[in-house]
UniProtKB/Swiss-Prot annotation:
Intravirion side: 1-12, 98-117, 169-199, 258-263, 315-346
Subcellular localization: Virion membrane; Host Golgi apparatus, Host trans-Golgi network; Host endosome membrane; Host nucleus inner membrane
UniProt record similarity statement: Belongs to the herpesviridae glycoprotein M family.
Listed name of the protein: Envelope glycoprotein M
Gene: gM
Lineage of the organism: Viruses, Duplodnaviria, Heunggongvirae, Peploviricota, Herviviricetes
């Protein structure tokens, strides 16, 4: 059966969206590579947003325009940027593989089969959200290079919103779990192999989201701490608490809603754990420099986040290995059995 007009239009839009995503990725990658080299148009090294070695607290207004708040050290920030770019590449490969499989799949008698397949794998809306995610991430790195911490906090907030929307779209396809399961059962037989690939991609996206929630917390507090007269220790404490609230809310959403769509979802929890590990070292360096009186509170809060995250992991493991057993009864086959069933219902 030939493709319907709806299939033709949706496939053309989808292909154009993937091409746009490819061009955006090339632009972002070239930008992220160039930002690591001097004399290429970027005034400062983005990863040295807080140069703790240059701080001399015995001199008044040593930093002037930038207060040394809690933030990632240069090596951590470089690794984070490279890691995100690699993950963007794998997401792009996923779209390309799905596109090739849809075009190479044999025609079926089902109406709008290609549209149904595209919707489940990741349609034009998710691809557009992916483009916005990469663009806002590029703006964030550029703002760090120009030492515009307030604008960097704003752009990272936009990035995090776009990335959260992209994650939800990839998991739910903005449908109910029943509808998503129904579409999954009716995708093209040749696309069955992409189910495992999509599960891996979703967990990788959640891993990025879990770690990015930590970066979001300290970036927002970095912007606030450099625009208002707030103690640095208060800003650091607020960063940890913000990370705790976000990790708790996101993990709770998975256990209450999103687990109905994808059963294997451990990426967010491991991303939060990596975020805890990534935040521990800057806190130790920060505490050794400023000798804050909130050291115990910092450690206690990190311990609480770790315990809560491990609790959600245990809960996810239990629900993953737990099987629902239904006791089926034999259907009535005789008139006597039907009479007994009617009497029981009465």
């Amino acid at each position: 059966m030939a493709l319907s007009r709806v299939d033709v239009i949706n496939m053309r839009i989808w292909v154009l969206s993937i091409i746009c995503a490819c061009l955006t990725y090339v632009n972002v990658t070239v930008h992220l590579v160039a930002v690591h080299f001097p004399n290429l148009g970027f005034p400062c090294a983005y990863y040295e947003i807080n140069d703790m070695k240059a701080i001399n607290l015995s001199i008044r207004n040593d930093i002037r325009s930038l207060t040394p708040q809690l933030y990632l050290n240069p090596i951590q920030l470089i690794c984070y940027v490279v890691f995100m770019d690699i993950c963007f590449f794998f997401i792009l490969v996923y779209y390309i593989v799905c596109c090739v499989k849809v075009f190479s799949s044999e025609k079926t008698p089902n109406i709008n089969q290609s549209t149904r397949d595209i919707t489940w794998m990741g349609d034009s809306l998710s691809c557009f959200q992916f483009v916005l995610t990469m663009d806002t991430y590029q703006f964030f790195v550029t703002c760090l290079s120009f030492r515009l911490v307030t604008l960097a906090a704003f752009t990272y907030c936009l990035f995090f919103i776009c990335f959260t929307a992209f994650t939800l779209t990839m998991i739910t396809q903005y449908q109910s779990s029943e509808r998503s399961f129904f579409v999954l059962k009716r995708i093209h037989p040749k696309l069955k192999g992409t189910i495992k690939y999509k599960t891996i991609i979703i967990n990788m996206i959640e891993l990025m989201l879990g770690f990015s929630s930590m970066v979001f917390a300290i970036t927002i507090c970095l912007g606030l701490g450099n625009n208002f007269y707030i103690k640095s220790s208060t800003v650091a404490f607020a960063s940890i608490n913000t990370f705790f609230v976000m990790s708790f809310v996101y993990s709770l959403v998975i256990e209450l809603i999103l687990h109905q769509y994808v059963k294997v979802q451990f990426g967010l929890h491991f991303g939060i754990l990596f975020g805890i590990l990534g935040l521990t070292y800057p806190i130790l360096k920060y505490d050794s420099l400023f000798k804050t009186e909130w050291t115990v509170k910092f450690i206690v809060n990190l311990a609480v986040i770790t315990i809560v995250c491990l609790s959600f992991i245990i809960c996810r493991l239990i629900r993953f290995f737990m099987r629902k057993h239904h006791n089926y009864k034999k259907l009535p086959t005789t008139v006597e059995d039907l009479d007994v069933l009617e009497e029981a219902n009465e």
